[in-house]
């Protein structure tokens, strides 16, 4: 049974526990519907009410939504605020100064607690140091850092100055880092000597040096290095500076620079179907508002909660639900440097038990890998740990299959914790379709219903609504405050990617297929409709991987598709044509390993193909177009039932089938 069939045949319903619902921010479906009705009646008034209630404005806004240059929407445009002030200073003023903001656990298990007062001082010292280096409002700063308090502080320091940050995941290669440095026009890079993952030191500074050596980064005048391990690093005098030295003797107060609500808070790169990563630009006001609203609604955050989002700050989940949302909510959160399987696969459960985590938010891929580990070794099964502090569970990054959902519900939540299966994207800024833990009856594998104010729908290829029970294209019909503003430096690509004329130019295209239940109207996400793969919750463009493969001197041609994978959700499958004869046996295995490592070096380890098949050529139409639908069937091990009448070289299908 396919994953989507499994979800559509799922009829188990789990209602919110009464004790949870009684104290929840949104305690019932009636309360949910009332908020949806409010948004329907007065859309701008709905958003304006929350923006005024929840955020501190240096200059109050008078305009709510400007649609005059759609789809380049503007929210709260004449208002001014500062994201760092809203995350830190307000906590100093409202009695949270000595509350722990971050419980940091290093890879080796060392624990550090940082209060809001201490975090504020750390951020201010770094912001002052950046100012002395000439970094100002509007400058772009790339952050290539390990999971750390310093990584979060670097983001907050940029926001404090009005500098736009662009965080690059520490697992990306020198080439990927260089592309982002060039595209965003960075004037500074903040990195670390090394990062620790699973007991191993990874050389971030060396990769950063390689990236800068590739050229095009002449605007980068300062490289600031956090001393994480004390490992030896290369050094360029006049350019490289230790983070400690930049912050030394700086005052621990720094006035937060007010910026317009539409000022770019950050640019975060995500994979596109055309190969070149897209710089998703987010605003300050609308983004921060939704980060805080979803902390309150989806996570039902309370003053005594201990929140733990296991994402990396290099992804949007780490932006919204580590660097901004929890701090804006005045929450205490866990930040974890390591991996879930070190020193063993009980690490997450051990940390929940030791720290008494109450809200736990992780990826389905992590859950599936931990299920496998727990089944292999009873000693690291979650039932061996005291997880009684948990009151809410969440999933993010990809759809979760009902089987994994049930295991998570029973073995981690002890059948007492609602699960918020959150659908959202880099481009949406925060949750879009998700259960509300005190209100929504849960169905395993379904992300259920859109949040109030989010006008999600399912349409056909012409933009017309499809009836419940019919699959279609997921869209959002009205702009919302946290939405992507543009693709950095490429407004035309923004319009074409997200507001295509084929759908009328007014609907936000999520890029995912979806279906709504006939009876409940619940949404189930069916996967990407474009050439973007979702591997372990990470979006990877097929074109990007193909370009990396073809850059290898041995490769003439390559095509990449996805196939379902029990562990990672989707696995990368590459079909490769060499410039020489097709290898077989041990030679093919050896070459496949070489090409995997090549892709890992070009893009990063997450992009390594799981399967590589060699062929004399690829299945193509007579006009030379690669027939990817046939490759998808081959990758899945399915019989070819599609029409192959336009296929120029039918024999290649059997060859590629045998090549597995």
Swiss-Prot record:
Catalytic activity: acetate + ATP + CoA = acetyl-CoA + AMP + diphosphate
Organism superkingdom: Bacteria
GO molecular function terms listed in the Swiss-Prot or TrEMBL record: acetate-CoA ligase activity; AMP binding; ATP binding; metal ion binding
Cofactor: Mg(2+)
Binding positions for CoA per the UniProt entry: 197-200, 317, 536
One cellular-component annotation, GO: cytosol
GO BP: acetyl-CoA biosynthetic process from acetate
Top-level EC class as recorded in UniProt: ligase
Residues holding ATP: 397-399, 421-426, 512, 528, 539
PROSITE patterns: AMP_BINDING
UniProt keywords, alphabetically: Acetylation, ATP-binding, Ligase, Magnesium, Metal-binding, Nucleotide-binding
Pfam families per UniProt: ACAS_N, AMP-binding, AMP-binding_C
PTM text: Acetylated. Deacetylation by the SIR2-homolog deacetylase activates the enzyme.
Positions where N6-acetyllysine occurs in the chain: 625
EC number per UniProt: 6.2.1.1
Coiled-coil boundaries: none
Residues the entry annotates as binding Mg(2+): 550, 555
Protein name (record): Acetyl-coenzyme A synthetase
Species: Cupriavidus taiwanensis (strain DSM 17343 / BCRC 17206 / CCUG 44338 / CIP 107171 / LMG 19424 / R1)
